[in-house]
Amino acid sequence: MEIRGLITRLLGPCHLRHLILCSLGLYSILVQSVHCRHHDIGSSVAHQLGSKYSQSSSLSSSSQSSSSLAEEATLNKDSDAFFTPYIGHGDSVRIVDAELGTLEREHIHSTTTRRRGLTRRESSSDATDSDPLVITTDKGKIRGTTLEAPSGKKVDAWMGIPYAQPPLGPLRFRHPRPAERWTGVLNATKPPNSCVQIVDTVFGDFPGATMWNPNTPLSEDCLYINVVVPRPRPKNAAVMLWIFGGGFYSGTATLDVYDHRTLASEENVIVVSLQYRVASLGFLFLGTPEAPGNAGLFDQNLALRWVRDNIHRFGGDPSRVTLFGESAGAVSVSLHLLSALSRDLFQRAILQSGSPTAPWALVSREEATLRALRLAEAVNCPHDATKLSDAVECLRTKDPNELVDNEWGTLGICEFPFVPVVDGAFLDETPQRSLASGRFKKTDILTGSNTEEGYYFIIYYLTELLRKEEGVTVTREEFLQAVRELNPYVNGAARQAIVFEYTDWIEPDNPNSNRDALDKMVGDYHFTCNVNEFAQRYAEEGNNVFMYLYTHRSKGNPWPRWTGVMHGDEINYVFGEPLNSALGYQDDEKDFSRKIMRYWSNFAKTGNPNPSTPSVDLPEWPKHTAHGRHYLELGLNTTFVGRGPRLRQCAFWKKYLPQLVAATSNLQVTPAPSVPCESSSTSYRSTLLLIVTLLLVTRFKI
C-alpha cells in the first residue's frame, strides 16, 4: 500500500503537523519505562498514523510518540549500479543451531512465494580451487566477480552470500538459523534482496528522499552478506563491517550511497555489509519462543559470527573487525557493544548519529507486546493477551507486505513501531543500566553527529510548517505552537523552560532563528545529546574515544539550503561517493572525502584515526577525554577543535529538565501565550523567575 494512500485514508490535513515533535516530547525522558526509537528517524511512514490511533494511544501510558525516520530510498535500475537484484534458495530447511544448541527439523513448502524470473543461484561445478574468485567457506564454495571502482581501481566482490536460512513460514519472527551447507559452487555475483519494508513515496521521485529506498527486490528471503576486497588480494587486512540505518523499519545494505568499491580500493580494507530483518518481521516481540523479539539483532549477530569464521579466507584479519553504522545502524553497533553475545565478535566501533540511550532506540517489553497485539488486531488475527500462540500462528500466515503496511497503526503517536527490547537474551538490562555499571565492551570508539540532525524528520512531520522549498521561515507564534505539539506530555513549567532554552534572546522574533531552533530541539534530544552521553561514559572508563561534529553540506545537495547539514549527510563521504566523477562533486569535496575515508580506515586499522606520522592533509584529531571532551569539526578547510558539542543544551535535557519536572509535577503553571506581547523577552520574565526558583529548590534542597 502506498504511503500517500495511507495519508489520505488515515490523516486529515490538520493532523499532519501533530506528528513530529511529539516524539521529542519529554515523555520518554520523564517516564523511563519506555525508550522510543535512524537515517536511522522521520520518515514518510509516520504519516500513516491516523487520528483513530492517536485516540487509542490514551488507553496505555506506555504508548508514546512515533517519530519515523525516512531512511528509505531510490529504486536505481542503472546497469552500472554496484548492486543488482537476485534471489535464490531451496524450499526445505534443516534447523541446526550449533551456537544455541538447538536441533529440530521444519519444512518450508514449495508454495513459498518467489519473484518471477529469479532462480536459484547455483553455477556448474566446474570451478577449480585455483580460481581466485572461488572461495571455500565453512558452508560451501562461492564464486565472486571482479568490479571496477569509479576511480578505475579493481576490487573482487562476493555478494549475496547466505549466512542464515531463509526466515520463511514457521521461521518468521524467530531467531535466525545458520545457513545449510550446499554442494557445487554458489554464484555470489549479484546483490541480495532487501528485507520486506515500506517504501517512501511522500515526495514522489525527489532524489533527496528516494536515495534511501531499497534498490533490490523486497523479500523475506533476505539474510545475506556482501564482501568487497581490494586488489591485489591482501593478507590480514582490516575489516570494516557496515550496518545500515533506517529506524529499524527500513533500510538495505545495497544502496548506491553505500557502494563499497571506493572505500575498499582506496583504503586497502575489506568492506563487509549484511542484510537484517526490519520492521515487525525483525522486531516483533511477544515474549514467546515463536516471537522472542530482537530477531534483527540476532541476524546481525549471526552475520558477525560468519565474518569471524570466514573472513580470513578473503584475506581479512578476524582480529581487526570494526563495526560501523549510522542512525539505527549506529544504535545496532552500540547494542553489540553492550551485549554479552556480541562483544567478542569484533574489536572496534564507529557510531554515526546514534546511541543506545536515544529515546527511540528501545521500548519496554510491555509496550512491545501491546504493539504486537495491535498489529494482530489490524490484520484480523487473534489478539488475546492470554493466547499469544494463536496470534503468532495467524501472523505467520499473513503476507509480509500486509504486516508492514499495517504496523504503523499499532501504536499511539510518534514512535518507530517495532524496535529492540530488553529480551533477557541479547540484552539483559537497559542500556542506561549497562553504561552506569560498566557492563559493556571496553574498546576504542569513534562517534559523532551532524549540525542539523533534526530537519530531516521535521520536514516529514510538520509538513504544513516546514515545506520542502526555499525561503521557509517560522514566526514566533508558530514556534510556540510547535513546542506545544512537540512536548504534549510535560507540564507548563517544563514546556516554558524548553521555549526559554531554545529562544534566540538577541532576536526572539527572528523567523530564521525560530525555524533553526526547532531543528536543534529535535536534533539535541534525539541524537547529539545521546551521542555525547555515550562518548562521555566510554571516556570515563578510560577507553580511547574520538568524537566529531560533521559540518559540510554538499554543493549539490537537493534539499533546500536552510536544511543545512542533515542527518546522514556524511555517509556519501565515508564511502567515497564524491570520487565518482559522473556525480558532479567538486575537487575540494573529493579531497574532503579522501580525508574522511582515511580517518575512518586508520581507526579501523589501528584504533586511532590519526596517521602514524603527522600529515598536513590530515589534521590531528585529539582524543575525547572525560574532562577535555574535545571533538574535531569535520568540514571543508577546517581544523577547528571544540569541546562538547552543545554541552549546555545537553545538560538541559539530561540533567535540568528531569529535575524541573519532578519539582513541578503538582504545580499549575500558566502556559506561554500563543502570541507574545509587545516584547517577546518580557513575556517570559515571570516564567523565568519561577524556573530559576524551582531549580534552586531542586539544587540546594531549600
UniProtKB/Swiss-Prot annotation:
Give the principal location in a single coarse category.
Answer: other
The chemistry this enzyme catalyses reads: acetylcholine + H2O = choline + acetate + H(+)
Recorded hits in InterPro entries, A to Z, give: AB_hydrolase_fold, AChE-related_enzymes, CarbesteraseB, Carboxylesterase_B_AS, Carboxylesterase_B_CS, Cholinesterase
Q: Which residues are modified by glycosylation?
A: N187, N637
Cysteine-cysteine disulfides: C195-C222, C381-C394, C529-C650
Active-site residues from the entry: S327 (acyl-ester intermediate), E453 (charge relay system), H567 (charge relay system)
* Single GO biological process annotation from the record: acetylcholine catabolic process
Give the signal peptide range.
Answer: 1-36
Where it sits in the cell: the answer is: Synapse; Secreted; Cell membrane
Which GO terms of the cellular component aspect does the record hold? extracellular space; plasma membrane; synapse
Matching entries from Pfam families are given as: COesterase
EC code: 3.1.1.7
UniProt enzyme class: hydrolase
Regarding the membrane, this protein is recorded as:
Peripheral membrane protein
Region of interest called Disordered, as start-end residue ranges on this chain: 107-134
Question: Is Phosphoprotein a UniProt keyword of this protein?
Answer: no
The similarity annotation says: Belongs to the type-B carboxylesterase/lipase family.
Function, as annotated, reads: Rapidly hydrolyzes choline released into the synapse.
Its name, as the record gives it, is Acetylcholinesterase
